[in-house]
Amino acid sequence: MPSFFPLFSSYIYHLVNDAWALTYTTVAVLQDFADDGVVYLELRTTPRSIQASSGNITKFDYVQIILDAIKQFEAQDERLQTRLILSIDRRNSLPEALEVVELCKQFQSQGVVGIDLCGDPMKAGIEALSPAFKAAKKISGLGVTLHFAEAPCSGTDEELKLLLSWEPDRIGHVIHLSSEIRQAIVDRGRIGLELCLSCNVHAKMISGGFEAHHFGSWWNNRHKGCPLVLCVS
């Protein structure tokens, strides 16, 4: 896992670095999901500004380019309907996080359906982002999803209680939980669990293979009211 997050800053961001690359990669991802028979997809991305030789891209432009690519794809293939979730990175400052909230509001009518907390779980200090997620909860129809307990360092009761206080509609990964937090999730009622089996196994975020994944435990207790969603990273 420590080698995973640097891939974005060291490689991926340097490859997807202009409008053409953004459009190309978005359409390629959509095609892969359509070919797999997916009919409804939610993509997530962290808005970023890009300095490119072909022209600088603002965070607003970044989101618009991706939404335009989605619209372009859906015009050619009606099998797949796609919506967008904008992510706040744990490394973001509060002003940067509030900018993402504002982008969600601006693009909600074009297909942005949610806001996410993502990024390197080793980055502490996320309590500074609380005002951004409280602002997001005030936007009617906007869902809130959070990367949750994906690593031991981000699985402390203190952090997880903070995240639950943001009133998320869904939480992702949900690996490193105390029994107290697990019960708190159940007590919340109808909070969606976004479980990423392939990511958790191949990135060695859990011990054991697919048969050891905590999906089975939650599935066997699905009568307790937590909807399960299978996701890919």
Protein language model regions, located:
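Metal-cofactor-binding active-site regions of metalloenzymes
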Residues: 1-142, 150-170, 175-191, 197-233
